[in-house]
Amino acid sequence: MLAKRIIPCLDVKEGRVVKGTQFLSLRDAGDPVELAAFYDKEGADELVFLDISASHEGRETMVDVVREVAATLAIPFTVGGGINTLADIRRILRAGADKVSINTAALLRPAFIREGADYFGSQCIVVAIDAKFDQALGTWRVYTHGGRKQTNWLATDWAKEAVRLGAGELLVTSMDQDGAKTGFDLPLLKAINEVATVPVIASGGAGAANDFVDVFKYNYADAALAASIFHYKETSIQEVKARLREEGECIR
């Protein structure tokens, strides 16, 4: 059995880590380099760095900050935001990242997933899916540009297509649960897990250690990502791992 992974997420805007609710109402959470070093020492299994306004603002990811963060880490590091070309992927990997997360660019041009996987390997390509429940459809719809633009893709269909094109991992964020701290969106994750044949990272909604227990108990995800509960010291990675050990989960 593969060990479940606990992944802190650094949402970065203008060089600072921020966190909001449902992608809005952002507040400062600290310096990305300092937080990265802290999480590495605390026992994080991986780290995700998302330049959350790069795609919306049409600019490149902050490579200098990525390089600084990578220099502090001994754990795998994924970077996303504003990655639109193979040259962007190469630049981020050379700056020290192990994987890239692509979202808007993949939806605008799905062939980009295959190009990235063919050139750098599927293990480097994480496709991020920002999904929000559509009451009229009774299912989840995918959004781009940091949750600002609705697409015609249903989350389950896009997950299947992303995997078919070469995604090595899916980072699934529930926009409904983002920052709400009421637990991961288990119905969404169940739906994605049923169609995905690659590892799924659960994101959006973690509010306590028991939320990690729930998402792993049903095997709806291979890893779980959280931001605000770690940034604001509401719980710690060690506390989450201790709780998972109590439940008999396989963790690092």
From Swiss-Prot:
It holds the Pfam family His_biosynth. It catalyses: 5-[(5-phospho-1-deoxy-D-ribulos-1-ylimino)methylamino]-1-(5-phospho-beta-D-ribosyl)imidazole-4-carboxamide + L-glutamine = D-erythro-1-(imidazol-4-yl)glycerol 3-phosphate + 5-amino-1-(5-phospho-beta-D-ribosyl)imidazole-4-carboxamide + L-glutamate + H(+). Pathway: Amino-acid biosynthesis; L-histidine biosynthesis; L-histidine from 5-phospho-alpha-D-ribose 1-diphosphate: step 5/9. Keywords: Amino-acid biosynthesis, Cytoplasm, Histidine biosynthesis, Lyase. The keyword Hydrolase does not apply. GO terms for biological process: L-histidine biosynthetic process. Its EC number is 4.3.2.10. HAMAP family: HisF. Belongs to the HisA/HisF family. NCBIfam families: hisF. PANTHER family: IMIDAZOLE GLYCEROL PHOSPHATE SYNTHASE HISHF (PTHR21235:SF2), IMIDAZOLE GLYCEROL PHOSPHATE SYNTHASE SUBUNIT HISF/H IGP SYNTHASE SUBUNIT HISF/H (PTHR21235). This is Imidazole glycerol phosphate synthase subunit HisF.
